[in-house]
Amino acid sequence: MDSHEVLLAATYLLGTLAAFCLGQSGRGFVGAQVMLSGSNSKCQGLVEVQMNGMKTVCSSSWRLSQDLWKNANEASTVCQQLGCGNPLALGHLTLWNRPKNQILCQGPPWSFSNCSTSSLGQCLPLSLVCLEPQKTTPLPTTTLPTTMPEPTAPPRLQLVPGHEGLRCTGVVEFYNGSRGGTILYKAKARPVDLGNLICKSLQCGSFLTHLSRIETAGTPAPAELRDPRPLPIRWEAQNGSCTSLQQCFQKTTVQEGSQALAVVCSDFQPKVQSRLVGGSSVCEGIAEVRQRSQWAALCDSSAARGPGRWEELCQEQQCGNLISFHVMDADRTSPGVLCTQEKLSQCYQLQKKTHCKRVFITCKDPNPVGLAPGTVASIILTLVLLVVLMVMCGPLIYKKLVKKFRQKKQRQWIGPTGVNQSMSFHRSHTATVRSQVENPAASHVDNEYSQPPRNSRLSAYPALEGALHRSSTQPDNSSDSDYDLQVAQRL
């Protein structure tokens, strides 16, 4: 072997060694089985590697940036190894969020020589989206227009975490096949039908309103996301009266300064809580609402001049129909909150006010206040005592009343009762004059007028004695009566 051949052999060996070293450091996936899981396609899903079992790679590995599209250039070789097209996105996507055993890798991109196990929940899984391979079909007789690969999944919508953490509110993202992004918002065109279709597809009820740019920018991040940002604008609405998602949106180029479509649906959660305070029952009082963990008075609003808001509030308190409502005078020391929607169920945000006109609500109480248990017990005890007294004292009182009535009935007046007649006396109808004389004690019991007073010498019947005295001088009329009726008649 001459010197020229030796030099060529040495150069070949050095080149092979250099290529091997560069390959091991720059493309560590060589020799490691990399696959994408979590979808029906081999070209999109969570990045997993075979290392004593399948491991899911964290999105913070190899110090990747948060820009999904910038990271895509680092995955060209991986997509080719998987038999897919060019890479589209590399980073954390919420499409697939069921990682297995997670590992965090350091060093050059796609190097698995310096990886450590990470506990579940400490890092977000890494996702990769590659272009689907084109299907090889026989050439048709006519030239077909160039089209994108057929989508592997039906088109769908997704909401970026909503306003103040509310469910069913936020920026709308549309995914159709391998293309995903937000929708261009045009303030001049606000089709309600499109909003209803979006909320219905998301199972969030009906469309309420659009979120402004300030409200969208102020959307807080969930705890599990470090830098949440919606995808770039890649779609725009093309038909406001569409019936399917594919008919509603068309592709568009990214425009700087454009606003993404953000909606609020009727089924947002949590809802505003309400109550009535300061009244005689839970169905009467001043309307208050709960914002976060504090209660505040609900101020009167021009958006709710009718009874609709207050009827809904009565229903929330499980009361009857609305009876009345009136606005109270504003007080400097009475702050509150304002709802700009017509009904409380539509209020996704509340505005603070320093001078609040409170509203006093009166609803029909389905359970009116009855007698207190103590009052009922007192009434029952009183009735029991009354019955006992009637049983014990009733017969005795009855006997006394009957006796008194009979004694009064036994007394009668005998004699003239004319104006010019002066003779009158009282006697018992059961006793005669003779019996009175013969048995004075018994007569005194029946008639207290039958005996003269013990301490007096006067007669008990002066008129009768006078008549008898005068009749003694007259001829005897052979009358069997105790006294002369003719003389008594003259008197």
UniProtKB/Swiss-Prot annotation:
The residue ranges for the Cytoplasmic side of the membrane come to: 399-491
Recorded GO cellular component terms are: cell surface; external side of plasma membrane; plasma membrane
| Annotated disulfide bonds | C43-C84, C58-C123, C79-C130, C105-C115, C199-C265, C242-C248, C283-C319, C299-C356, C314-C363, C339-C347
Q: Can you say where in the cell this protein is located? A: Cell membrane
Transmembrane segments annotated in the record for this chain: 369-398
Q: Does the keyword Iron apply?
A: no
Q: How does it sit in the membrane?
A: Single-pass type I membrane protein
List this protein's GO terms for biological process. Answer: apoptotic signaling pathway; T cell costimulation
Q: Which InterPro entries match?
A: SRCR, SRCR-like_dom_sf, Tcell_CD5
**Disordered, as annotated region:** 467-491
Q: Where is the composition biased (Polar residues)?
A: 470-480
* Signal peptide start and end residues: 1-23
Residue stretches in coiled coil:
none
SRCR domain location is 34-131, 157-266, 274-364
Q: Which SUPFAM superfamilies match?
A: SRCR-like
Q: Please outline how this chain is modified post-translation.
A: Phosphorylated on serine, threonine and tyrosine residues following TCR stimulation. Phosphorylated by LCK on Tyr-449 and Tyr-483 upon TCR engagement.
Sorted alphabetically, which keywords does the UniProt record give?
Cell membrane, Disulfide bond, Glycoprotein, Membrane, Phosphoprotein, Receptor, Repeat, Signal, Transmembrane, Transmembrane helix
The Phosphoserine modification is found at S435, S456, S479, S481
The UniProt function text for this chain reads: Lymphoid-specific receptor expressed by all T-cells and in a subset of B-cells known as B1a cells. Plays a role in the regulation of TCR and BCR signaling, thymocyte selection, T-cell effector differentiation and immune tolerance. Acts by interacting with several ligands expressed on B-cells such as CD5L or CD72 and thereby plays an important role in contact-mediated, T-dependent B-cell activation and in the maintenance of regulatory T and B-cell homeostasis.
Its assembly, as annotated, is: Interacts with CD72/LYB-2. Interacts with PTPN6/SHP-1. Interacts with CBL. Interacts with CD5L.
Q: What is this protein called?
A: T-cell surface glycoprotein CD5
**Originating species:** Rattus norvegicus (Rat)
